[in-house]
Amino acid sequence: MGETLGDPPVDPEHGAFADALPMSTSQEITMVDTEMPFWPTNFGISSVDLSVMDDHSHSFDIKPFTTVDFSSISAPHYEDIPFTRADPMVADYKYDLKLQEYQSAIKVEPASPPYYSEKTQLYNRPHEEPSNSLMAIECRVCGDKASGFHYGVHACEGCKGFFRRTIRLKLIYDRCDLNCRIHKKSRNKCQYCRFQKCLAVGMSHNAIRFGRMPQAEKEKLLAEISSDIDQLNPESADLRALAKHLYDSYIKSFPLTKAKARAILTGKTTDKSPFVIYDMNSLMMGEDKIKFKHITPLQEQSKEVAIRIFQGCQFRSVEAVQEITEYAKNIPGFINLDLNDQVTLLKYGVHEIIYTMLASLMNKDGVLISEGQGFMTREFLKSLRKPFGDFMEPKFEFAVKFNALELDDSDLAIFIAVIILSGDRPGLLNVKPIEDIQDNLLQALELQLKLNHPESSQLFAKVLQKMTDLRQIVTEHVQLLHVIKKTETDMSLHPLLQEIYKDLY
């Protein structure tokens, strides 16, 4: 990208981001109008005004989400958690899959964990972690640690096996009228009372369930834990209110949530299946079948497919930046930070969040585009000429590993807030208030993951490691943009993206 990629004129003190941020006084900052090929610019404090982008050369509405490096966590409580960059997957195979294979591939993944429930959001004040006994689910029969949901109740392996043997072998025990107390140490002393306790708590051979714990049962259990935690720590109710606030803001800011995307990818939606784009012919058909927000101008339709797709990615990136900015303004304490620090946090954080949320739209075979109307295959994107064919592959590699963590939207709402409030960004003026906010968010995220994923004891550390991976992906993305700038002299980058990428890694 030659001379057309020069930096656009912006406010020298704050830049284009400042126009989208609230002011602490009545003073307003407006961005100088910039004329660039392909896109007019208008980034106001209000929600995205799509009408001003109608002339954008947009072919496919892929969410090109980006990311960066998380070398340290600002809160001292978390500094000793090791971060490692996962080895990238190698996928160097020829593109020879057919349409039918990709249509079936859309449904290869299990559905994402269900929608957010307020009952699942349980938090503690910093450094006031609840006892381990509250975190473990107890066997309803003897009080030992439950291994899962067996015969209709949470039970340990011992009581599960005892009940199964009794039912299958039709065992009859000598009657006991002492109503013996059944606990971990005494459970083997009186088999009659133990079996009666199994029946009393609801164990039944007809209640065998396969798969994960039902959401209703999970919420009931978490509500019981919530009550116990609130009794020990009354302030946890305030943090749960914070979690609900973040989730509500997340839902309002991002139209296509992970839950909606996974429903489309797994075929669990009443809407029609997305149109699959897997080669040049299906690409041309898709332009007729998919309702894109922006029609490609006639003068741009003759451009090479790789360039048109890349420009479509740019448009979606700009739209995503505005969505993330709106979300950031709803994080408690963010708008009270120095305006320059707000701009810096967004500059370095938006692409990390973009790639985090892009993972929700991906499976190992492709990515949803145009709000779920289309599905563009991974192999088709990789088949584009270099350097364009190299852009999406690192994002797919990250997405496959990140999706394996099975975070849901309520987890992601806190996770992306943690990304934004990173106190180690270059050029911050006042780090202390940023670290204070992030420390609170980290505590919230840790407890959220413990309660929402009780079977994954190391999930918090794994999630933090993904923040390191995200920064590496952004670094690689910026390097590819430098290559395009040198080789594609007839292309231009959107002025807002130019400002974000300027001096970024």
Swiss-Prot record:
Organism field: Rattus norvegicus
Molecular function via GO: alpha-actinin binding; arachidonate binding; chromatin binding; DNA binding; DNA binding domain binding; DNA-binding transcription activator activity, RNA polymerase II-specific; DNA-binding transcription factor activity; DNA-binding transcription factor binding
Similarity remark: Belongs to the nuclear hormone receptor family. NR1 subfamily.
Activity regulation, per record: PDPK1 activates its transcriptional activity independently of its kinase activity.
Entry annotated with the keyword rRNA processing: no
Function noted in UniProt: Nuclear receptor that binds peroxisome proliferators such as hypolipidemic drugs and fatty acids. Once activated by a ligand, the nuclear receptor binds to DNA specific PPAR response elements (PPRE) and modulates the transcription of its target genes, such as acyl-CoA oxidase. It therefore controls the peroxisomal beta-oxidation pathway of fatty acids. Key regulator of adipocyte differentiation and glucose homeostasis. ARF6 acts as a key regulator of the tissue-specific adipocyte P2 (aP2) enhancer.
Organs and tissues of expression: Highest expression in adipose tissue.
InterPro entries per the UniProt record, alphabetical: 1Cnucl_rcpt, NHR-like_dom_sf, Nucl_hrmn_rcpt_lig-bd, Nuclear_hormone_rcpt_NR1, Nuclear_hrmn_rcpt, PPAR-gamma, PPARgamma_N, Znf_hrmn_rcpt
Keywords associated with the record: Activator, Biological rhythms, Cytoplasm, DNA-binding, Glycoprotein, Isopeptide bond, Metal-binding, Nucleus, Phosphoprotein, Receptor, Transcription, Transcription regulation, Ubl conjugation, Zinc, Zinc-finger
Subunit comment: Interacts with FOXO1 (acetylated form). Heterodimer with other nuclear receptors, such as RXRA. The heterodimer with the retinoic acid receptor RXRA is called adipocyte-specific transcription factor ARF6. Interacts with NCOA6 coactivator, leading to a strong increase in transcription of target genes. Interacts with coactivator PPARBP, leading to a mild increase in transcription of target genes. Interacts with NOCA7 in a ligand-inducible manner. Interacts with NCOA1 and NCOA2 LXXLL motifs. Interacts with ASXL1, ASXL2, DNTTIP2, FAM120B, MAP2K1/MEK1, NR0B2, PDPK1, PRDM16, PRMT2 and TGFB1I1.
Record-given protein name: Peroxisome proliferator-activated receptor gamma
Pfam families documented for this protein: Hormone_recep, PPARgamma_N, zf-C4
Domain of life: Eukaryota
